[in-house]
């Protein structure tokens, strides 16, 4: 590979990393981790409400994404109204009915990842159930700590970038005498 080509490739490599935010003293955003866990609860004549809470001390962002509500074995052919109690944009508690299930006409309802911020309370407002509520508990964590291993890798990367940048300059070709 010619020295000029190597210099051009080193420049392009350096330029693309700079635009991506990873070189030249630019701050790289904190790594984000996302975990997802199954969620489920059952409301019935014996258990008429369930509250989903998370620890307040936790710095992570929690989301409860509801996927489905369905009547389970032993349900009577009656209206089962499920209500969700949560907080609105003004942090005021509100109660909203989200499903009216009946065994003979609508035994289940898909909620298509209906997202709620905890704490959330589910109440069986009418009917005797049992009503099964399913979904996913999603936890998004932003890591502020950069491990020593990552710091060392970044330093090694910067050192190799500096070495690539210190390529020899392109010199003009020597004239060869005697050729017409």
UniProtKB/Swiss-Prot annotation:
Sequence segments annotated as region (Disordered): 141-180
GO MF annotation terms: chromatin binding; histone binding; RNA binding
Gene Ontology annotations of biological process type: chromatin remodeling; rRNA processing; rRNA transcription
Residues the record lists as Omega-N-methylarginine modifications: 27
Acidic residues bias: start-end ranges: 146-166
Post-translational modification as stated in the protein's UniProt record: Phosphorylated.
InterPro entries: Nucleoplasmin, Nucleoplasmin_core_dom, Nucleoplasmin_core_dom_sf
A Pfam family that the UniProt record links to this protein: Nucleoplasmin
GO (cellular component) term, any one: cytosol
Keyword terms, alphabetized: Acetylation, Chaperone, Methylation, Nucleus, Phosphoprotein
Modification sites for N-acetylalanine: 2
Entry keyword Cytoplasm: no
Predominant location category: nucleus
Record localization: Nucleus; Nucleus, Nucleolus
Entry function: Plays a role in the regulation of diverse cellular processes such as ribosome biogenesis, chromatin remodeling or protein chaperoning. Modulates the histone chaperone function and the RNA-binding activity of nucleolar phosphoprotein B23/NPM. Efficiently mediates chromatin remodeling when included in a pentamer containing NPM3 and NPM.
Subunit annotation: Interacts with NPM (via N-terminus). Forms a pentamer with NPM at a ratio 4:1 (NPM3/NPM). Two pentamers form a decamer.
Family: Belongs to the nucleoplasmin family.
Entry protein name: Nucleoplasmin-3
Species annotation: Pongo abelii (Sumatran orangutan)
